[in-house]
């Protein structure tokens, strides 16, 4: 949501993709910074609902397709209801 900061975005990525310790990212990562910019712009343009997992996943794919592919390759993407 619009109250999530950089650390919250990094946490979501690490958790959603179940990244192993060696691949975890932090709030200073360029992907996290770019996502925050996009999210902030969405809310600045009037969005008032939270972004869902699918939207965030697609955002990562749009920003960095190679990294997205790497994350998904772990094969442990958190599924709904899990």
Question: Predicted regions: what is each one?
Answer:
Residues 1-82:
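Terminal or standalone catalytic/regulatory effector modules within metabolic enzymes
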